[in-house]
């Protein structure tokens, strides 16, 4: 029986996540971004949690002294409303995962010359939220107050990556009607653009 193929970008992220979860020994410390620093020059802040994974090279967060150099396998978790000032001073391959309420956003950066570059690959995938992802994200947000508890934090992040792999490796549910798909698309658009001014052209 022939396996159903995923779209190319989705398959790329499925393979990337498989490489991470099947080789957990390559994953290192989990760092946490801080809230309340979104006014800093160059800062990036989101309404939803985000996880950055350094696949190769060096990356960093200029807002926190101990996070200015993150190396291969290290991760930066940003709770909702937390901010970071990304550092792309050296070559780096970076996976960034955004956890929105009804969809998962994945971005792959390959900065060969030590400077910020547009995302090479980017997908947004709807997912049925049954509570497991929200529970893990909430636990990580609480654990940001005690970042030294890596023996608890790292297995939790590995579980979160397993969940991401499951979502990315799955095709959309066959029973999704046109109306449901349209509703999900509208929700995604509102979540991304609710703070922008609304006009006929922007819609």
Model-based region annotation:
Residues 50-52, 75, 85, 94-98, ...:
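Short hydrophobic beta-strand segments that form the core of ligand-binding sensory/regulatory domains
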Residues 117-130, 143-202:
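Short, Lys/Arg-enriched, Trp-marked, Pro/Gly-tolerant hinge/linker segments that flank
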């Amino acid at each position: 029986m022939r396996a159903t193929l995923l779209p190319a970008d989705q398959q790329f992220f499925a393979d990337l996540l498989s490489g991470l979860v099947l080789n957990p020994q390559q994953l290192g410390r989990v760092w946490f971004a801080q809230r309340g620093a979104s006014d800093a020059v160059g800062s990036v802040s989101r309404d939803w949690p985000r996880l950055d994974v350094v696949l190769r090279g060096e990356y960093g967060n200029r807002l926190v002294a101990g996070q200015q150099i993150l190396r291969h396998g290290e991760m930066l978790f940003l709770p909702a409303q937390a901010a970071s000032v990304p550092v792309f001073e050296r070559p780096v391959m970076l996976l960034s995962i955004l956890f929105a309420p009804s969809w998962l956003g994945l971005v792959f950066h390959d900065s060969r010359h030590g400077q910020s570059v547009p995302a090479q690959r980017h997908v947004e995938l709807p997912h049925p939220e049954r509570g497991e992802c929200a529970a893990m994200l909430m636990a990580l947000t609480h654990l940001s107050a005690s970042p030294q508890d890596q023996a608890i934090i790292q297995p939790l992040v590995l579980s979160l990556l397993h969940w991401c792999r499951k979502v990315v490796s799955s095709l959309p549910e066959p029973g999704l009607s046109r109306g449901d798909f349209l509703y999900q698309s509208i929700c995604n658009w509102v979540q991304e653009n609710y703070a922008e001014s609304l006009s006929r052209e922007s819609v």
